[in-house]
Design a protein with these regions (language model features):
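A structural boundary signal for the start of the first folded domain, especially the loop/turn
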Residues: 1-56, 63-128
Length: 128
């Protein structure tokens, strides 16, 4: 399945997940499903095309080569470390193995958004 093979309903589901991730984390999330001819280099090039790439996260999935790449901008990488990305990839692979592309992307995006969420700050001066 290439990007053009996604149904409108699937596109909306992915878009909703990306919007929710932005609300949760304050970071811009993007997803790409399609060929990555140069592997990770292609994913990095696609990430660079995102407005505000330094604060953005791209999940790139190449179904034909069965690869998943997560590219984080320099600012996004502060909150989303390699371990978080590996966990998200593991979650996505699990869904993909069950033939659930959209669920996999949604799981990965939500996991990354939760890791990027700013921690709640409790002040000592606030009443309990």
């Amino acid at each position: 399945m290439e990007t053009g093979d996604l149904t409108p309903k699937q596109r909306v589901a992915i878009s909703n997940a990306l919007d929710l991730a932005r609300e949760i984390s304050g970071r811009c999330f993007a997803a790409y499903v399609g060929p990555l001819e140069q592997g990770r280099d292609s994913a990095i090039a696609k990430h660079a095309q995102i407005p505000g790439a330094e604060t953005s996260v791209l999940i790139a999935v190449d179904l034909s080569s069965r690869t998943i790449d997560i590219v984080t901008g320099t600012q996004a990488a502060i909150d989303i470390d390699d371990r978080s990305c590996e966990l998200a990839i593991l979650a996505m692979r699990s869904n993909f193995a069950a033939d659930d592309l959209i669920g996999g992307i949604r799981s990965g995006v939500m996991l990354l958004a939760e890791h990027a969420r700013a921690p709640r700050v409790l002040h000592l001066n606030d009443p309990a």
